[in-house]
């Protein structure tokens, strides 16, 4: 049994019990008393912001809202509905029980909605714009982090004056504890949306800015350690290279170095700010930290993204699981009597999908779900709002007419009443999971005289191939080097105070307003005028 499934099964019963208690506590209430003095974000006049604020305010007037002390936003990057369904079946089958009727921890949360993920300029958005919608309450252009649609892509000067306050920055100003966790680089789009303000999501280090003036725009890593986010209590993820000088060897991989061209070691600069800070890069260092103390922790466990869950145990220096990081963060942030705001991202679900590698996407979804179960166990349903959602979907499909119990990663095995049988019109078998586009459409067959790969893009025979192998890539229709995002609505699950506002079909940027109003950090629209 795979580690992610084992962790999930061990916590699922407890998560279901927690969710049962949550269902009672999340019932509509006429109480709207804020816990804090609301802070008006600088983006309050943005059209998208105002529209979402008004929509949430109407629901509050109709349903009421209980005040929350804490907020946890779980973002499964690229975790569309088909990913959730496939992961559910995979979890059950891996545990030796019925997969189709299995239930993930996230699915036990009592409130749910569909969230519309389009950006200001794209039907199918990227993670930067969608994450900004959830952390700052406005829709913006794809590729933008923490700036409004008034800016121009890659133009530093145009971004000046378009910056948005994030819920995490507002929470800090109000005295709450704050944290961000991701299995991706901590400067990547989704975690970066908690603090960064750039018109180009790829400006993760100064060396990435390519001609942009560092006097006008700061790279994302520099913003993390120089801005309000420098005082985040817990920062855990990957991406060390963006914080280390180009001449500095990586502490885990001596043959690799940092990526910064300015010679600055931003991790050392962060640690030197006061005596309460600890940096960490491996599992042993993580385990040695007393998260029940007032320590601030900055942990970056890989030069780039953290390992996929399927590969994590083989990591050279070892790294904690997403569940372990979540437990540590909640332990640390709960010390603040005023409450906390935390983001937890399962960032590598998305990367596996881009690679057309469904098994790693499913394994990382289950690791993400185990973190959700841990949060349900550790928090009080009466005072903690938990929202679980995705930033966008992917082109993963569950297709054919496979029989009940057919391995979700296997070939379609049709039953007697199935239309179309188990083979395609070309006489070849196909898998239940496939992608509309991506690298699985072609196979490298040879190299030309210059060493460039040659490809065969005809559908190949899967007979005798282990389609559940770790490196198997599901077949796809349109050949692309990287599979794309999907534009359909994504699921949002919620529990705790304010969860009753997560229902129906909502705009993605309304999630910010639900969180902000529940914890009392942002004012109602009437108070903004």
Protein language model features and the residues they cover:
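N-terminal export and membrane-targeting signals
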Residues: 1-7
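A post-motif C-terminal structural segment
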Residues: 38-50, 64-69, 79-85, 89-132, ...
């Amino acid at each position: 049994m795979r580690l992610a499934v084992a962790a999930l099964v061990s916590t699922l019963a407890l998560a279901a019990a927690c969710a049962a208690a949550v269902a009672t506590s999340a019932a509509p209430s006429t109480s709207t008393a804020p816990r804090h003095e609301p802070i008006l974000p600088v983006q309050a006049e943005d059209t998208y912001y105002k529209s979402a604020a008004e929509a949430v305010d109407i629901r509050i007037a109709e349903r009421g809202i209980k005040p929350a002390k804490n907020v946890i936003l779980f973002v499964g990057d690229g975790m569309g509905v088909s990913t959730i369904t496939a992961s559910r079946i995979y979890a059950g089958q891996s545990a030796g029980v019925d997969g189709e009727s299995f239930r993930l921890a996230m699915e036990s949360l009592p409130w749910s909605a569909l969230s519309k993920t389009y950006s200001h300029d794209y039907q199918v958005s990227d993670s930067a714009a969608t994450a900004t919608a959830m952390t700052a309450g406005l829709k913006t252009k794809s590729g933008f982090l923490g700036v409004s649609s008034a800016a121009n892509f890659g133009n530093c000067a145009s971004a000046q004056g378009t910056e948005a306050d994030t819920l995490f920055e507002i929470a800090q100003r109000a005295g709450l504890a704050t944290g961000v966790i991701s299995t991706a680089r901590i400067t990547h789009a989704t975690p970066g949306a908690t603090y960064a303000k750039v018109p180009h999501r790829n400006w993760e280090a100064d060396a990435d800015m390519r001609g942009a003036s560092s006097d006008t725009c700061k790279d994302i890593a520099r913003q993390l350690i120089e801005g309000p986010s420098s005082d985040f209590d817990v920062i855990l993820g990957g991406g060390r290279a963006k914080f280390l000088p180009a001449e500095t060897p990586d502490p885990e991989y001596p043959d690799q170095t940092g990526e910064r061209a300015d010679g600055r070691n931003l991790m050392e600069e962060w640690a030197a700010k006061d005596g309460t800070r600890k940096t960490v890069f491996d599992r042993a260092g993580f385990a040695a930290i007393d998260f029940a103390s007032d320590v601030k922790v900055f942990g970056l466990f890989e030069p780039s993204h953290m390992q996929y869950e399927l590969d994590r145990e083989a990591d050279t220096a070892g790294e904690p699981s997403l569940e372990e990081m979540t437990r540590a963060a909640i332990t640390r942030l709960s010390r603040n009597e005023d409450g906390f705001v935390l983001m937890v991202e399962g960032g590598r679900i998305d990367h596996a999908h881009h690679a057309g590698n469904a098994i790693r996407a499913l394994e990382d979804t289950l690791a993400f779900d185990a973190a959700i179960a841990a949060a349900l166990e550790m928090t009080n349903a009466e005072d903690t709002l938990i929202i679980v959602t995705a930033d966008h979907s992917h082109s993963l499909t569950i297709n054919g007419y496979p029989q009940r119990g057919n391995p979700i990663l296997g070939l379609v095995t049709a039953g007697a009443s199935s239309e179309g049988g188990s083979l395609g019109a070309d006489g070849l078998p196909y898998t239940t999971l496939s992608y509309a586009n991506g690298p699985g459409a072609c196979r490298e067959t040879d190299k030309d005289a210059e060493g460039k790969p040659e490809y065969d893009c005809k559908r190949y025979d899967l007979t005798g191939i282990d389609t559940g192998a770790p490196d198997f890539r599901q077949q796809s229709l349109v050949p692309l080097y990287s599979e794309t995002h999907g534009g359909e609505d994504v699921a949002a699950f919620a529990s705790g105070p304010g969860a009753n506002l997560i229902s129906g079909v909502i705009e993605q940027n309304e999630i910010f307003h639900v969180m902000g109003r529940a914890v009392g950090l942002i004012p109602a629209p009437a108070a903004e005028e």
